[in-house]
């Protein structure tokens, strides 16, 4: 068991100071909520590394290693904030179907697709070019649905990942 742990530090402090007990209660509830929400990141970004609760825990582990015994100097609100930051920073990577539809319907997104045709990322560039070719001519291949899904996933991931910080902020503020 780790000697220095942010969660245990917050719990111990809140157990000793009744006026802070709500902090630990909200952290516990929000950790569960965020963990469930972050499971959905894999649906939009299957080609990325995991961005679920295990990713948040890995971040916390690194922070705990860096802070060491200085964790004991953190106030309960600072500890609460660090814990939440580790879990909430990728909430903006969870994209709802409605948001996808809205994005794909905007002129801004069409301009983004134009930019991607010149992308240095070969897979992304080819995904856009292929979708445009499909739109123009159609594809008779048996595997076209799989290629369409893959192409759209690459484009969606690139578009929404670049905005995930502001989307995380908006999600938290809702």
Model-found features: residue ranges?
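Divalent metal-dependent catalytic cores for phosphoryl transfer on phosphate-bearing substrates
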Residues: 72, 76-174
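Boundary/activation segment at the start of structured domains
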Residues: 1-33, 37, 41-43, 60, ...
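Hydrophobic faces of stable alpha-helices that mediate helix-helix packing
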Residues: 31, 56-60, 165-169
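Alpha-helical phosphate/pyrophosphate-handling elements in metalloenzyme active cores
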Residues: 45-81, 94
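Active-site flanking loop/helix segments enriched in acidic
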Residues: 33-58, 150-155
